From Swiss-Prot:
Species of provenance: Bacillus subtilis (strain 168)
GO cellular component: cytoplasm
Its job: Participates in chromosomal partition during cell division. May act via the formation of a condensin-like complex containing Smc and ScpA that pull DNA away from mid-cell into both cell halves.
NCBIfam families xref list: SMC-Scp complex subunit ScpB
Organism lineage string: Bacteria, Bacillati, Bacillota, Bacilli, Bacillales
Protein's GO biological process: cell division; chromosome separation; DNA replication
Family that this chain belongs to: Belongs to the ScpB family.
Annotated keywords: Cell cycle, Cell division, Chromosome partition, Cytoplasm
Keyword Cell division attached: yes
Listed name of the protein: Segregation and condensation protein B
Gene: scpB
Length: 197
């Protein structure tokens, strides 16, 4: 393996943290780490064992040859309280992501980032934690990226009964360049937000 098991576990932890809620496939880990499958299996088993302890708040989840870090279900009541704690208003970037998701759902993080032109992972995590967005499925294709959509809480917070009440987009919105499309989403959505404040 080259490195000792402690170093490998730390590297895997960093990779899974950076991958966020999309996780990493076994193939991706093998490619990045440049090791053989038996070695990876040993490392992942050790990582999983370490997270099983009572002193850890996260656990390693494996599904369909994909690994991801997740909070333990035992701590759900505390996470729920965190979501319910009043927080400051949404940033412009958060409103922009909400606008894109609300009009284009279901949509992947990569598609959101393509429209915005910047990374959006932290904003997505924050909006999911606030229960404004949620996972609505998985995209077809390599990696099976998470598809995001809005939640009933989103509708409630923005004074909407259904998504049909969102301001309509101009018919030529699909023909605009990506940056103009992002600006249009934000402009329309921000107006709705201002109207209900």
């Amino acid at each position: 393996m080259g490195l000792d098991i402690v170093n490998w576990k730390a590297i895997v932890e960093a990779l899974l943290y950076a991958a966020g809620d999309e996780g990493l496939t076994k193939k991706q880990l093998l490619t990045v780490l440049e090791i053989e499958e038996p070695e990876l299996n040993t490392i992942m088993a050790d990582v999983a064992d370490e997270y099983r302890g009572d002193t850890r708040g996260i656990e390693l989840i494996e599904y369909a040859d994909t690994y991801m870090l997740s909070t333990k279900k035992d701590f759900a009541p505390y996470l729920k309280k965190l979501i319910e704690v009043p927080s400051k208003g949404l940033s412009q970037a958060s409103l922009e992501v909400l606008a894109i998701v609300s009009y284009k759902q279901p949509i992947t993080r990569a598609e959101i980032e393509e429209i915005r032109g910047v990374k959006s992972e932290r904003i997505l995590h924050s909006l999911v934690a606030k229960a404004l967005l949620c996972e609505v499925g998985r995209a077809d294709g390599p990696g099976r990226a998470i598809l995001y959509g809005t939640t009933p809480t989103f509708l409630e917070q923005f004074g909407l009964k259904t998504l049909d009440e969102l301001p309509p987009l101009p018919e030529n919105a699909e023909e605009d360049v990506l940056q103009e499309e992002a600006d249009l989403f934000f402009e329309n959505f921000n107006q709705t937000f201002e109207d209900i404040k």
